[in-house]
Amino acid sequence: MKTLDINQIKQYLPHRYPMLLVDRVLTWESGKSITAIKNVTANEEFFNGHFPHKPVMPGVLMIEALAQTAALLSFLTMGQKPDDNSVVYFIGIDGARFKRPVEPGDQLKMEVEILRNARGIWKYKATGSVDGQLALEAELMCTMRTINDAGSTAGQ
């Protein structure tokens, strides 16, 4: 079983505090799938304003956690680490549904499967769960560009 700790994750994802939303990879299979976790603590910055009386992880950050997990799978599949000359863009989302809130103390388990990779566009099926209960699901798309090509249209 292939796993990654936070130090290994930081070699593949350019995100840093407070935007790094993947804490550990439980398992991954190149070209297929990945399972990772985000430990949601009461100390998360976003809980200060979302919402002080009933803190819940913003849906957009749950999607971002899935997208980071997907990007991690792509980098691992390509055997490539990000560098100063490349950028990964999150370019699409379909069928996003939120099924339960994610609160302080929860562990968000993220499962991402590659559906396809064509013309430089990766498509994934992604889910997040807490204690075996589905919290969110979506299909995600992303692409990688060199800095010089970063303004070009996806897929070109």
UniProtKB/Swiss-Prot annotation:
Question: Could you tell me one molecular function GO term of this UniProt entry?
Answer: (3R)-hydroxyacyl-[acyl-carrier-protein] dehydratase activity
Subcellular location(s): the record lists: Cytoplasm
Offer a single GO CC term for the protein. membrane
Q: SUPFAM superfamilies per the record?
A: Thioesterase/thiol ester dehydrase-isomerase
For this UniProt record, the keywords arranged alphabetically read as follows: Cytoplasm, Lipid A biosynthesis, Lipid biosynthesis, Lipid metabolism, Lyase
UniProt GO BP: fatty acid biosynthetic process; lipid A biosynthetic process
EC number, as in UniProt: 4.2.1.59
Q: Which residues form the active site?
A: 50
* Signal peptide (residue range): none
Major location category of this protein:
cytoplasm
- One Pfam family of this chain: FabA
Domain of life, source organism: Bacteria
User: Which NCBIfam families does this entry report, sorted A to Z?
Assistant: fabZ, PRK00006.1
Q: HAMAP family per the record?
A: FabZ (MF_00406)
Q: Which PANTHER family match?
A: 3-HYDROXYACYL-[ACYL-CARRIER-PROTEIN] DEHYDRATASE
What the protein does comes down to:
Involved in unsaturated fatty acids biosynthesis. Catalyzes the dehydration of short chain beta-hydroxyacyl-ACPs and long chain saturated and unsaturated beta-hydroxyacyl-ACPs.
Tell me the protein's name. 3-hydroxyacyl-[acyl-carrier-protein] dehydratase FabZ
Instruction: State the species of origin.
Output: Herminiimonas arsenicoxydans
Gene from which the chain derives: fabZ
